[in-house]
Each structure stands twice: as C-alpha cells, then as structure tokens.
Amino acid sequence: MVKITGSQRIDLLGIRKADLPAVWADLGMPSGQAYTKGVRMVKTCVGTEFCRFGTQDSTAAGIEMERRFEQLFTPHKVKMATVGCPRNCAEATVKDIGLIGQENGWQVVVGGAAGKSVRKADLLITVETTEQALEASELFFQYYRENANYLERTYDFVERLGIEKVRKETVYAPEPARKALLDRLVKAKAHAPDAWLEGRTPKHKTQFIPLTPLETVNA
C-alpha cells in the first residue's frame, strides 16, 4: 500500500524486510524516520505561492528547515511545521518547533503537542527574516538535544524548565553561547549517519535476510 500521510509523507506499507534494500535501490531516494528518536518531518502549508492569505514563503522555509535537521537524533521524536500566516493550516502551534508567518516576519514557537494531551506551543521569539527564524529553531533544537532527559518530549522539557529560562539560554543568550550551540549543531550534522545508505550497502547483510534456525544439537 502507498499512503499519503497527514504529515505530508509517503508511507510504503507491506514490504517484506528482505526486499527493502532492493526497493530503496530502485527508488534512489532517502528515507525519512518513522520510529526513531529524532526528526520526523517538517509539515508546511503552501505559503505565499498558492494562498492569498500567505504572508511568508512557508514552503521554502520548511524545505530549508528539514535540510538543516534531517538525520539528527534527539531525546525523543521531534515534529516541526511552518505556516505562512496565523491561520495555521499546517498546525505549527502544536508542533515541537513551529514557524508562523506574520506580515513583518516570523513567530518561532516551541513545545507544542497534538497527541493524547494537546498543548499549545510557547512563543520563543519573534523575528524579521527567515534566516533569523531558522537560527532560533537551531538554537532551541540543539539546546533540547543537550539538556532534555531521554524520552522527554519538548513540551515536557519546556514546562520543566520554563519558557523564560529556555529563552534566556538560547535566543537571548550572549553571542558566544549562541555561537557555541550552533557550532555543536553543525558538527553533529556533519557526522549524522544515513541509516538507509548503510541499508543499501550493509556491513552485515543478515540485517535484511532471515536467519536459518539452528538445528538442535544433542550432547
């Protein structure tokens, strides 16, 4: 089955595990993460290009956002979204990190949730440019990676620390501290593994091949 998901991804369902390397070789494209503790997706609306209400190019911002964060691991799953106006069609206010387009810039919000317990994201900062919004997202993202407990979602993390402390230690931190956070994120990104590239040329092919059961050996 091929399914278009609510997070704007494509699910390929029902494929045998042993066939996965051949399937990805034929597709010639990377895979997103479905279950890992890391970045899941960046959902976008159509922004200024196809919507009369759009005030910012949310599609381009979302593409760049995904490029900066894909393949990175985190204490728990991270979902992101960008919307071109406050109508919030891509649900940025209930994502771990969201960018909300305004007439004169972006609101960056963090710590939202839309699952069993719904939580509206907190405002991290309001900025004028897309690059500033992306940098604010990077600061929060790396701060969360370094300071959250394992299996702690961003909404629990923000509530535990308080949004004022989060702001103080990310977007309003002294310039050297901000630069250090960003440098560590860049370094992590440079060494981020591509699990599906490894899957196409596995060191141990038995990862995708069923093992033959061992016969019982009598003493």
Residue ranges and their predicted role:
Residues 1, 28-32, 70, 74, ...:
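Generic secondary-structure signature for well-ordered alpha-helical cores
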Residues 71-73, 109-118, 179-187:
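Short, conserved aromatic-histidine micro-motifs
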Residues 162-166, 172-173:
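Glycine-centered helix-coil hinge/cap
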Residues 79, 84, 88, 93-153, ...:
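Mobile "lid/hinge" segments at catalytic clefts and subdomain interfaces of large enzymes
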Residues 16, 54-58, 62, 129-133, ...:
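Generic structural signal for well-ordered, non-membrane alpha-helical segments
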Residues 171-205:
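Acidic, Ser/Thr-rich low-complexity intrinsically disordered segments
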Residues 1-6, 75-78, 146-160, 179-187:
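Flexible, glycine/charged-enriched surface loops at secondary-structure junctions
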Residues 1-107, 201-219:
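Small-residue-enriched alpha-helical segments and adjacent helix-cap loops
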